[in-house]
Amino acid sequence: AVPRLGADFLEAEARRGGVTDAAQARNLARLACGDRLELEHLLSGSGDASRKEDFDLFCSLMRLSYNDRHLELIGWAEEAAQLSREQQRAFLRDAARLLRESFMLHAGIPQIGYLWGEELAFCTKFAPFVGTRNIEPLLAQIEEASAQIAQNGNPTIVFTHFALAVSKMIRHL
């Protein structure tokens, strides 16, 4: 296996790639996790649109879940079902990542997180609702939904069940 590249090297690469702010270059190097290709993706902005769409879908799900807006959650599930299967699975992976990051913020160890910008702002506010009692069941729901999507389950049914299950878990810490 090829070892990961050092943060200093990636930071220098980010600066060569056009990043002028030292803090932003350091942050991009950290987010790349030692992967030069990931740094190039971050620098080029490729995948930003889908990542933003996933983030907006996640925020919407969590806000509706917290407020117990069940009819709107069904509408959310129909919206999520319109995505392609790969986009649905990518959303679920991203949702798991954001929940884990929120849990780390809740646990008081933000320095090991990989959030920035509006993801960091949202997850900082959302962190109190992701605790030791609900993080594992939430991640289990995500894994179950992802497996069902991979097995060609009806996405409307899968996401409706997923959204309603998440709603029950977010309110009960």
How should each PLM-predicted stretch be described?
Residues A1-D94, L98-L173:
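Charged, glycine-rich active-site and insertion segments that engage polyanionic ligands
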